[in-house]
Design a protein with these regions (language model features):
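Pseudouridine synthases involved in rRNA/tRNA modification
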Residues: 1-39, 212-217, 225-286
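RNA pseudouridine synthases
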Residues: 2-180, 186
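Short histidine-centered loop motifs in beta-beta connectors
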Residues: 48-50, 209, 215-223
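Short, surface-exposed secondary-structure edge patches
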Residues: 52-56, 221, 257
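Short coil-to-beta-strand transition motifs
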Residues: 76-79, 198-206, 259-260
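Conserved hydrophobic positions within beta-strands
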Residues: 84, 170, 207-210, 243
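A short beta-turn/loop motif at secondary-structure boundaries
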Residues: 132-135, 200, 212-214
Length: 286
């Protein structure tokens, strides 16, 4: 278990071919403006000498960054079994069960995945979820262990470098076993949770392949090309195949929630930049 992360020291050797302002250098290496503010005073040194943000990094210089790591407040530790599908020094991925919120929020009852993670790290941790799943969606939730990794992973996800695959149980039988849903999504109205397909929405693309059907419902594998809120649920309802049991976009089934599982996540590693693939077993079928 890796949990002794109170301060993160990051050492970078400059491979730039010319002198670079220290702030630009840090931005080039994945630090956000917020993180740079944290290390502004006394948190950066070049070749062993503490410097200010006016300093210049020359080719071959050794830059040391000290990032203070805070502990999440207000998230109590609650012991629970965790299905850890990946862990190293920089991040941890858990197969979140169905009917569990990712983190505490208004309207979300305890326990949440965040409570379990805090217990896993003995309370000495900042909860940094990179992707989030709805309460009723199961599967891979990725969390960074330090501020630098969180910034690198979040930037990578914003650049579209994450590939997320899901399995879902949807209503009806498909004529075509493979398809792409390209339909923009926006909120139904201001302040509403529900989303709809609309011409003035944000670009949203979902690719799917039918695995099998039982004559009434179908099991589909889904690849997200974008990451809009409720994208899978909205898109499959839009084409007439809502998720079975989806109370918001389909037909409510008493004492049953929809089946949607994130079973694969592919991404560049925040430190090595090598592409890794994380998988989590799906517990449901037709």
């Amino acid at each position: 278990m890796f949990w002794e992360l109170f301060v993160e020291n990051i050492k970078i050797i400059s491979t730039n071919e010319k002198d670079t302002n220290i702030k630009d250098f840090l931005l080039q290496h994945g630090l956000t403006a917020t993180l740079i503010k944290k290390v502004k005073y006394g948190g950066v040194s070049i070749n062993g000498t503490t410097v200010t943000m006016r300093a210049v990094v020359s080719p071959g210089d050794e830059v040391l960054i000290i990032l203070p790591d805070d502990v999440s407040e207000g998230i109590p530790s609650i012991d629970m079994p965790l299905d850890i599908v990946y862990e190293d020094e920089y991040m941890i991925a858990v197969n979140k069960p169905q009917n569990m919120p990712t983190h505490p929020s208004k309207g979300n009852s305890l326990p949440t995945l965040a409570n379990g993670i805090m217990a896993y790290f003995n309370g000495n941790h900042t909860f940094r979820s990179i992707n989030r799943l709805d309460r009723d969606t199961s599967g891979i939730v990725l969390m960074a262990k330090d501020a630098f990794s969180a910034a690198a992973l979040s930037s990578s996800m914003k650049r579209g470098e994450f590939r997320k695959k899901y399995i879902a149980k949807v209503a009806g039988i498909f004529k075509n076993k493979h398809g792409v849903i390209d339909a923009p999504i926006r909120r139904e109205s201001e302040g509403e949770m529900k989303r709809i397909v609309a011409p003035d929405g944000k670009n949203a693309v979902t690719e799917y392949t039918v695995i099998r059907d039982d004559g009434q419902n179908s099991l589909v594998e889904i690849l997200l090309h974008t990451g809009r809120t409720h994208q899978i649920r909205v898109h499959f309802a839009y084409i007439g195949h809502p998720l079975v049991g989806d109370f918001l976009y389909g037909e409510r089934i008493e004492n049953k929630c929809y089946n949607l599982h994130c079973f694969e996540l592919s991404l560049p590693h925040p430190k090595t930049k090598e592409r890794i693939t994380i998988k989590a077993k799906c517990e449901f079928d037709l």
